[in-house]
A protein has these predicted regions:
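Acidic (Asp/Glu-rich) sequence patches and key acidic residues
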Residues: 1-192, 202-203
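Conserved GNAT acetyl-CoA-binding A-motif
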Residues: 194-198
Length: 203
């Protein structure tokens, strides 16, 4: 079953003399899509890439001084029990405490087609495959590289299976980059501590 993200970008309401008065300015549902790389990196949800997350555990919703006036709070309540892992992160934390240069061995098994020049051509990746036995899955997850011939109708192909490598920079899709750019613009206007991303997930 897939997992999706919902939530809002919030800023401290003008005039910013009261740090407790936040207002919702961007509904992220309309902007970003499902991206397990970003879910895992920021909030440790569906972290199949094995990134070191900015937040290891959900923080819950922020404490709203006036929850009845908060679009974010009311929308999260509307989701009820279908929502889980509520959390939030300030733009400052996003910028300073996220390791954007990570390159790690992921939990994804990748398969490659050997080429005549000795290189491997990437063909795809998965968590589980009917083409591999349970024992082979286990061996690969323990770091072993397996070469196997797979039959396709009357033909066959040789593939190499091994754990893949994940790079944070490769996981940032254009929609998520747009979100980060918008948060950066807001932070320049109202301050890095006065911009935050509030989210929850559903399966």
């Amino acid at each position: 079953m897939g997992c999706d993200i919902h939530g809002y970008v919030e800023i401290v309401k003008y005039p910013r003399s009261s740090p407790d008065w936040w207002t919702s300015v961007i509904e992220i549902d309309s902007l970003v899509g499902r991206n397990y790389g970003m879910f895992g990196l920021l909030f440790n949800q569906r972290n199949n890439d094995n990134y070191k997350p900015t937040q290891e555990y959900p923080q819950g919703l922020p404490k709203y001084k006036f929850p009845e006036e908060s679009t974010t709070f009311k929308e999260s309540e509307r989701w009820g029990e279908d929502a889980h892992s509520h959390s939030w992160i300030s733009y400052k934390d996003l910028k300073e405490n996220t390791d954007w240069n990570q390159e790690v061995t992921s939990n994804y098994i990748c398969f490659y087609e050997p080429q005549n020049d000795g290189t491997l051509l990437y063909r795809g990746g998965f968590m589980m495959s009917s083409e591999l036995t349970d024992e082979e899955h286990h061996r690969i997850r323990c770091g072993e590289e397996i070469t196997k011939v797979i039959k396709f109708g009357e033909g066959e192909k040789e593939y190499v299976y091994k754990l893949g490598t994940s790079k944070v920079k490769d996981s940032i899709s254009s929609d998520w980059q747009t979100l980060f750019d918008m948060m950066e613009s807001l932070a320049k206007h109202v301050g890095e501590d006065n911009v935050r991303l509030v989210v929850w997930f559903d399966n």
